[in-house]
Amino acid sequence: MSQTATLILTHGQIHTLDRANPLAEAVAIADGKIVATGSHDRIMSFAAEGTQIVDLKGHTVIPGLNDSHLHLIRGGLNYNLELRWEGVPSLADALRMLKDQADRTPSPQWVRVVGGWSEFQFAERRMPTLEELNDAAPDTPVFVLHLYDRALLNRAALKAVGYTKETPDPVGGEIVRDSRGNPTGMLIAKPNAMILYATLAKGPKLPLDLQVNSTRQFMRELNRLGLTSAIDAGGGFQNYPEDYEIIEQLHAKDQMTVRIAYNLFTQRPKQELEDFERWTDMLKPGQGTDFYRANGAGEMLVFSAADFEDFLQPRPDLPQGMEDELERVVRHLVEHRWPFRLHATYDESISRMLDVFEKVNRDIPFNGLHWFFDHAETITERNIERVKALGGGIAVQHRMAFQGEYFVDRYGKEAVKHTPPVAKMLELDVPVGLGTDATRVASYNPWTALYWLVSGRTVGGMAMYDDDNRLPRDVALELWTAGSAWFSSEQGKKGRLSAGQLADLVVLSKDYFSVAEEEIKGIESVLTVVDGKVVYAAGHFSPLAPPPIPVLPEWSPVVKVPGHYRSAPPAAAKIGAMVQMHQCCGSCGVHGHQHDIARRSSIPVSDEQAFWGVLGCSCFAF
């Protein structure tokens, strides 16, 4: 007798990523697992009284997306405090959003824009000025983080953090000052971003009960974008077990809607080995459940190995003592069979790290232990081969989609063509998983990352890659699903819609496999299923949606700006995509003025009369 399904989805285009059965019309689910995929008639044989049957009406279905490098646990604690500029088409819009939020934000709270945007996404192609931040929010502290390189603080924020003429510059950072020595509000990473993160940490925090709400809101936003799993990369100011209280509470109450495998990130420079000795006594890799489980160490193993990825600054040279410190930690991890990950941007750093790994491997064989580099933008073919020889992998994120213009400015157009060399990694048969590295710099939107991989373009539209380093859509998707599963040692358990695998899937708003490249960025989920249960539904599927979770506190930016900017309805999407390709060049078909003149103007965007052009009329939106 066949197993009875609790949920059947039918009449769809189901891309299973199962090579034995790649395309199906229907899928049957029971007990949180895939029972079978196939034709409507075959799958309906698993139906019985009480089976929920959903008509997909031809929608495309894919396995749930899995971000192999996301700072979800930390990001969730702060999500309700942050105004998102991801995908916002103009600086004028961004500043208007900021002003509206400043007007709603009670003292002593801040308005924070923390990552996910680039000035090149804006029609104006520039960052806000400090004057514009002060005009938008004269009394409310404002903190705007730009990539890994700088933060902009208005006068109220400078007062809140206490930076004055007497405040010294921290090591690796600069407080920009005026001619009298007073801080202007600009903080620069040179190249250490600690000045940025330490300043952000001075802001008010949500109480624990609201951190619960914030984390649930963040997971629901990720579900809206089709994410069902993530590998949490730890982070600064995220100590274990103290800062895991909220996520463990949600796990205990069955309120998680994104599966998390978590890595532990050392918090104490020069005491890293002590951190990992304590944690290896507390946890075993894989300990937990399919929703929340320990994954190993990293992405920070020792602070001396951190090669900061600020392409506005020269490549940093790691200190001479790095190898000895890294060897002690890696030796301990391998002895305890703890998987590990390590942040590494530059090939020069990777070469030295691999020297350490090879030395340890000669004494204590890695022997199938899962380990991997994160990022690896400039890794060479020779070092990819060394990674493979040690059984390692490479987790790649879309940081170049946000920093590509700066990389070209420093290293040139030829150098960027294989930064990172994803196609070469695949050619050499090294495990590759994809992700975002959100939330402090890049966007958490997986479709921005898929667009980058497929098109080879930045969020500002700059073409970086030739065809030989762009990925076919099916390959890019597989790396976002089954590919990422390797990095939490869950290959064969998730990432494909095949019998016995976890029932995590996404019904898409558009057909990823056929829409124009520019439309990939606007894809989202209309139905997300995790563990066989609906965790998000929209549009035609809205009646299936779980109950809404009210956003708290009531002044939270998420109330008015619920996450990533949403693109125009399908009828207008083609026009919007065209504008992004052409960067607002040419004349307005309605008024006849020249958009490109306005785009390149340095006139403040608040001066609407002088700035008549792209932003002086409604045509800029099209």
Q: What spans do the regions from the language model cover?
A:
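Non-cysteine beta-strand/loop elements that form the S-adenosyl-L-methionine
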Residues: 71, 289-305, 391-401
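Flexible loop residues that form catalytic
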Residues: 17, 116, 235, 376-377, ...
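Acidic (Asp/Glu)-rich catalytic clusters
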Residues: 250-254, 280-292, 364-366, 387-391
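His/Asp/Glu-enriched, well-ordered alpha-helical/loop segment
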Residues: 331-341, 345-371, 375-376, 381-385, ...
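C-terminal functional module detector
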Residues: 485-487, 493, 507-520, 526-613
